[in-house]
Curated annotation (Swiss-Prot):
GO molecular function: protein-membrane adaptor activity
Quaternary assembly: Interacts with GET3.
Protein name: Protein GET1
Primary localization: endoplasmic reticulum
Compartments in which it is found: Endoplasmic reticulum membrane
Keywords: Coiled coil, Endoplasmic reticulum, Membrane, Transmembrane, Transmembrane helix, Transport
Residue intervals annotated with topology Lumenal: 1-4, 132-155
Organism of derivation: Ajellomyces capsulatus (strain H143) (Darling's disease fungus)
Recorded topology in the membrane: Multi-pass membrane protein
Database matches in PANTHER family: GUIDED ENTRY OF TAIL-ANCHORED PROTEINS FACTOR 1, TAIL-ANCHORED PROTEIN INSERTION RECEPTOR WRB
One of the protein's GO biological processes: tail-anchored membrane protein insertion into ER membrane
Residues annotated as transmembrane: 5-24, 111-131, 156-172
Topological region Cytoplasmic: 25-110, 173-206
Function: Required for the post-translational delivery of tail-anchored (TA) proteins to the endoplasmic reticulum. Acts as a membrane receptor for soluble GET3, which recognizes and selectively binds the transmembrane domain of TA proteins in the cytosol.
Amino acid sequence: MPSLLITALFLNVIIYVINTVGAATVDGLLWLLYIQLPTGTSQIAREQRHMKREVVQLKHEMSSTSSQDEFAKWAKLRRRHDKALEAYEAKNNELTQSKSTFDITIKIARWAATSGLMLFLQFWYSKTPIFTLPPGWIPWQVQWVLSFPRAPMGTVSIQIWSGACATVVALVGDAMKASLAYVSKPKIDRIKLGATMEGKEGKKRQ
């Protein structure tokens, strides 16, 4: 069943990427994308940013105004600042509540679309072979393991295929990370060496 074979592989790749990047990072990126959409939450986010800039500006004006020499102006700025700060905190709390709801929703959706879907496929297609092995190719004991738990004898079950995909994806991913680290390390070493040489030359000039 090629479509099921590819689906299981694709899901394992997605799960590995999410685990490597970090679920919190993925959620943060999705939140940034979400508040760019034309929704009520994006309107709240824009208002919150505008209020924050206003509070910072008023605070800067207060700092540059003497409370002794220009008390009337300073007091007026203080009242405006306090009022703007109160409005900002209320809007920020509203945005925080929206983000909490979004985080819960996205966690459920992410699990359902990855691990939840994988569990469903393993249950629903437990009797469906991913592919059939050539007759007599391997001993029957190995065939039994590959068909575990409910696939026909002489085939590979989705559980075994999914486990194999997860292992291979993890190995390939770790190899890629190690290769990138190895390639980038000489550059970092050259930068450190250059900084050390410049420091030594500077000391010699002194």
